[in-house]
């Protein structure tokens, strides 16, 4: 399953881990995705949404 937000499309980015001696090692920064039950067109579905979209109110959770 892809690490991509279903609302904004945010995905993994690459960067470096930098040690104290400034040696750099490649790494990936993955978005904080949560599995959320929401209503789309009157039907309950499960989406993987980043926390930034949840906090911004772009997705409304459904009571379990």
From Swiss-Prot:
Which residues fall in a coiled-coil region? none
Q: Which organism is it from?
A: Bifidobacterium longum (strain NCC 2705)
Q: Which GO terms describe its molecular function?
A: structural constituent of ribosome
Return one Gene Ontology term, BP aspect. Answer: translation
Domain of life, per UniProt, equals Bacteria
List cellular component terms (GO).
Answer: ribonucleoprotein complex; ribosome
Protein name in UniProt: Large ribosomal subunit protein bL28
> Does the keyword field hold Nucleus?
no
Which family does the similarity line name?
Belongs to the bacterial ribosomal protein bL28 family.
List keywords of the entry alphabetically: Ribonucleoprotein, Ribosomal protein
């Amino acid at each position: 399953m892809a690490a991509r937000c279903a609302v904004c499309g945010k995905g993994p980015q690459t960067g470096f881990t930098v040690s104290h001696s400034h040696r750099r090692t490649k790494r990936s920064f993955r978005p904080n995705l949560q599995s959320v039950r929401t209503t789309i067109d009157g039907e309950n579905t499960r989406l993987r949404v980043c926390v930034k979209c949840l906090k911004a109110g772009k997705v409304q959770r459904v009571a379990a």
